């Protein structure tokens, strides 16, 4: 499920085609995941072409929460590490909304203690939590320009 972060252009192209075939099946099977432990969804992802190369969280806004705290309520799984996504100007993302509300700083603190296995630690933490929603997107990263370049 977790992959090496280095790939050739040909490997990335092959993976992209497999992802384009796999990800729409998540939409078709969504009802099989919602209300079930996240382990069922992660088992499907583990057996697919989608390799987790980065994880982010779905979190509440500090503006909406008491004392500016933020809470984790889901995960964003990325098929590329940040540097590669920025270079390629695209990334596939699976978003999983969970029936949970973890305080963000404690969540990330616990993950950081796992060292290089931090992504695996995050997934393990979520396995028994019920899935409320799952979606995906092929996100294109826009070209960044400064005001002096315009």
Predicted segments — roles?
Residues 13-36, 44:
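Terminal, regulation- and interaction-focused segments at domain boundaries
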């Amino acid at each position: 499920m977790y992959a090496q972060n280095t790939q050739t252009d040909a490997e990335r192209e092959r993976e992209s085609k497999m992802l384009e075939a796999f990800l729409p099946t998540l939409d078709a099977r969504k009802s099989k995941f919602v209300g079930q432990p996240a382990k069922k969804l992660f088992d499907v992802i583990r057996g697919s072409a989608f390799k987790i190369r980065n994880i982010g969280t779905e979190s509440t806004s500090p503006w909406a929460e008491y004392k500016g705290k933020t809470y984790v309520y889901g995960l964003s799984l990325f098929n590329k590490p940040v540097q590669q996504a920025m270079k390629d100007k695209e990334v596939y993302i699976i978003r999983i909304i969970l029936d949970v509300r973890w305080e963000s700083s404690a969540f990330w603190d616990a993950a950081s203690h796992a060292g290089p296995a931090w992504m695996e630690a995050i997934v393990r933490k979520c396995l028994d939590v019920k899935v409320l929603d799952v979606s995906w997107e092929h996100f294109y990263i826009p070209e960044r320009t400064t005001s002096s370049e315009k």
